[in-house]
Amino acid sequence: ENDDKASMWSTKDIYDKIYHETGIELVFDYHHHRFCTGGLTEQEALELAASTWPPWVKPVVHVSESRAIEQGDPKIRKQAHSDYIKKPVESYGQNHDIMLECKKKELALLQLRAQVTERHQQIKEKTCL
């Protein structure tokens, strides 16, 4: 998994320096990527990490958001995890197994599921008109 500090391991660093030595798949962390890009866009880093997984296995990704932004409190570390996920997860057309990293655990999952279901229903209604 990529780190959440610019001075540490980006997805590209892990791919170049560890994956080629070990063959162990990379887990992409969306939240960490915001702090340690390694010069890659989110999509590029996600695709690079996904390329390390066998084609018959869905890549695992970690999804979380900043607690400081959620709470509107600049005193909280930006890397700290929020209670819930507010924004839709951008998959760039790929399938992943998503692991949520939220303080509210199962409640966060249920809330995100409701948001996705509602969004899907809205899209369905617009396209069926």
Give the ranges of each region predicted by the language model.
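Acidic/histidine-rich catalytic cores of soluble enzymes
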Residues: E1-V60
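C-terminal accessory extensions appended to soluble enzyme cores
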Residues: S64-I69, P74-L129
